[in-house]
């Protein structure tokens, strides 16, 4: 599975590239400087600043490798360039209505690393997203939730 392509929106790719750029151009040089400065303080065995800086360096280098791996495996999908004809696909913004409460909620279906429920972005592998994929406006889906079965109607499908 390590070589499988992972779907990602253009915004998700841009965010990862920005983070990678910051890590490489700002964080990495700053930590190298902090390590050099801590080294100048003498005995490394009891030098807390040195050990903290080395630990931080490991975290930064690990994150850089993680982002580079994600970007190399990313399949960037720009939903605005796909003719989906009203069908829910990866990258679509979907408004659903709970048929019992008539409460409407809008979600964007994104890659796993982009998911952010506070900003109404759900992972393509989430149960709700999986149920919505390939459905169309007017269709209904039923999900098993901890509170029992919930039925939603797809109110709108947008590609933005």
UniProtKB/Swiss-Prot annotation:
Its Gene Ontology molecular function terms?
DNA binding; RNA polymerase binding
Keyword entries, A-Z: DNA-binding, Transcription, Transcription regulation
Q: Which domain of life is it from?
A: Bacteria
**Which processes are annotated in GO (biological process)?**
DNA-templated transcription elongation; regulation of DNA-templated transcription elongation
Q: Which PROSITE patterns match?
A: GREAB_1
Query: What Gene3D superfamilies does the record tag this protein with?
Result: Transcription elongation factor, GreA/GreB, C-terminal domain, Transcription elongation factor, GreA/GreB, N-terminal domain
Kindly give the Pfam families that the UniProt entry links to this protein.
Answer: GreA_GreB, GreA_GreB_N
InterPro entries, per database record: GreA/GreB_C_sf, TF_GreA/GreB_CS, Tscrpt_elong_fac_GreA, Tscrpt_elong_fac_GreA/B, Tscrpt_elong_fac_GreA/B_C, Tscrpt_elong_fac_GreA/B_fam, Tscrpt_elong_fac_GreA/B_N, Tscrpt_elong_fac_GreA/B_N_sf
Bilayer-crossing residues are: none
Similarity comment = Belongs to the GreA/GreB family.
* The protein's role, per its UniProt record: Necessary for efficient RNA polymerase transcription elongation past template-encoded arresting sites. The arresting sites in DNA have the property of trapping a certain fraction of elongating RNA polymerases that pass through, resulting in locked ternary complexes. Cleavage of the nascent transcript by cleavage factors such as GreA or GreB allows the resumption of elongation from the new 3'terminus. GreA releases sequences of 2 to 3 nucleotides.
Q: Which NCBIfam families match?
A: greA (TIGR01462), PRK00226.1-2 (NF001261), PRK00226.1-4 (NF001263), PRK00226.1-5 (NF001264)
Name the UniProt record assigns to this protein? Transcription elongation factor GreA
Organism, scientific name: Francisella tularensis subsp. holarctica (strain LVS)
Provide the organism lineage as a comma list.
Bacteria, Pseudomonadati, Pseudomonadota, Gammaproteobacteria, Thiotrichales
């Amino acid at each position: 599975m390590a070589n499988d392509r992972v779907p990602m929106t253009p915004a998700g790719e841009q965010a990862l590239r920005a983070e990678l750029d910051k890590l490489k151009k700002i964080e990495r040089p700053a930590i190298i400087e902090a390590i050099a400065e801590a080294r100048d303080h003498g005995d490394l065995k009891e030098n807390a600043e040195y050990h903290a800086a080395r630990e931080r360096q490991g975290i930064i280098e690990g994150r850089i490798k993680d982002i580079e791996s994600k970007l190399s495996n990313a399949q960037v999908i720009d939903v605005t360039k796909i003719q989906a004809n009203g069908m829910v696909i990866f990258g679509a913004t979907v408004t659903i209505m709970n048929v019992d409460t008539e409460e409407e909620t809008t979600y964007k279906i994104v890659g796993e690393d982009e998911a952010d429920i506070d900003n109404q972005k759900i992972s393509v592998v989430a149960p709700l997203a999986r149920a919505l994929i390939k459905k169309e406006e007017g269709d209904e889906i039923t999900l098993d939730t901890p509170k029992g079965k919930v039925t939603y109607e797809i109110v709108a499908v947008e590609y933005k």
